[in-house]
Amino acid sequence: MQHNRISSPASMLADPTRAAIVLALMDGRSRVAKKLALDAGVTPQTASAHLRKLVAANILACEARGRFKHFRIAGAEVAHAVEALSELGAAAGRTLPPAAHELRFARCCYDHLAGRLGVAITERLPLLGSGVLAELGIDLDALESQRRPLSRCCVDWTERRPHIAGSLGAALLRAYKDRCWLLAIEESRKLVVTPRGRAMFVERFGVDEALFAAS
């Protein structure tokens, strides 16, 4: 039935342990079951049972590397759905947990930038010329030839406004990291803006300097 296409994946994420496991993987990296058990605060046996269900539901993908299995988000569409569900929870009036405040300014949303900085850049993009993207080594024609959509709006669960996803969103985040404008934090979705990154986001993208002062 049509409603099963919604209810089945939603029921997978309704369980707090499975939700914690999926959210731990929203930085786009893969992890072993033992680490995900620690992230979710459960035993390895319990985590393994939940991981099997998430893989069977095509929410997570599993890859064997030597003796260990590594788990990751199954794809961009899954990450987009998880972010949308997170935004629905925020819109329902739930208070953000303390850990979420650390992620609010800049974080990975699977393979693109989210948070206040991600939203601010997204709002500035239509005002910028293609030269800014070219300076970052981003080839729009090459991105448009991919099967993945060039851009799409991903509603930010902390800001409740859209940030850019799609192949362009992923290319932008890669460019920021390659130029050390943003630094990833190990085992976290949080991204740190470097002094050079702050200067470049203000100079090249026109992001308000006050945004960084308030972070």
Which positions does each model-derived feature cover?
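Accessory beta->alpha helical hairpin/"wing" motif in late/C-terminal subdomains of nucleic-acid enzymes
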Residues: 71-74, 127-139, 186-203
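Base-recognition residues in the alpha-helical recognition helix of bacterial helix-turn-helix
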Residues: 23, 48-49
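Beta-hairpin "wing" of winged helix-turn-helix
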Residues: 55-65, 72, 185-186
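Basic, amphipathic "hinge/linker" alpha-helix immediately C-terminal to the N-terminal HTH DNA-binding motif
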Residues: 63-88, 197
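Amphipathic alpha-helical dimerization/coiled-coil segments
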Residues: 1-4, 27, 78-126, 130-131, ...
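Key DNA-contact positions within bacterial/archaeal DNA-binding proteins
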Residues: 45, 52
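N-terminal helix-turn-helix DNA-binding core of bacterial DNA-binding proteins
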Residues: 4-43, 69-71, 108
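Conserved hydrophobic residue
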Residues: 30-31, 60, 182
